[in-house]
Curated annotation (Swiss-Prot):
Keyword ATP-binding: no
Protein name according to UniProt: Small heat shock protein hspG1
Family the entry assigns: Belongs to the small heat shock protein (HSP20) family.
Keywords: Stress response
Domain sHSP per the UniProt entry, residue ranges: 43-182
One Pfam family, short name: HSP20
Domain of life: Eukaryota
Amino acid sequence: MATIFDILNSINNKNNNHSNYYSCKRLKSNNNNNNNNFRNNSIKRIDIIPSMDVTITDNNIIIETELAGISKDNIEIDIKDSILTIQGEKKINNNYKQQQQQHSDKTKTNNELPLIEENKKEFRKYLSERSFGNFKRCLDLTSILYQLDLSTIKSNFENGLLIITINKKSDLSNSSFKININ
């Protein structure tokens, strides 16, 4: 049975013709008892799937992911079973609510009870188009993992753009080695 991720990936691959990579796919567990595994693992809802560009050069692979409005401390990157995973959480900025609360605290007096009630009213957003919550993006490196030197992984996060660079292993095709027979 196809999951929603399989369907989205097939649509994405048809539109972008990038069959080597996928957005995010549930990894199957090797554990035979899936019910216990389901209960023990903390499963997070994915609210955001960030945009990603992958560039392969002669010397390295460059992965650029848009993570605007996300703190560096809320981003987690790892590679497991040849899958690069970028995940974390985009939190709501509560500065406006805090400013409103500080303003209402300053205006409180004993003889102004109606004013206190007015200041306790919640504000209402006029327009809200931004997304908040958990994000996750996976990249299958299986087809090129043998070419990569994972000890050279570097990441840089600036102006909402996460750039991960992995150098390729030095080219051994031009070198010749003599192999001794024992």
